[in-house]
Amino acid sequence: MTTGNGQSQQPISNLEYDFITVLHNKAEAVKAYDCYIKDAQEINSQPCVELFQKLRQSEIEQAQEVRHHLQQVM
């Protein structure tokens, strides 16, 4: 719903909410990968450690991109 001046009466736009939700999910994924890396280290599986580190880094990079877009729409 919008007011007469075209502004939404919602505290944040749907797009802002979407970006915040994605950013939260990326942060949770990074935290999960930390656990997965630890598990792989405990059984001395270097290939698994490296894979989880690569996936974790990808999540971080995606989170940074999402954050940039969120700043643009706020």
Task: Kindly label every feature range from the protein language model.
Residues M1-M74:
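Iron-associated oxidoreductase/ferritin-like identity signal
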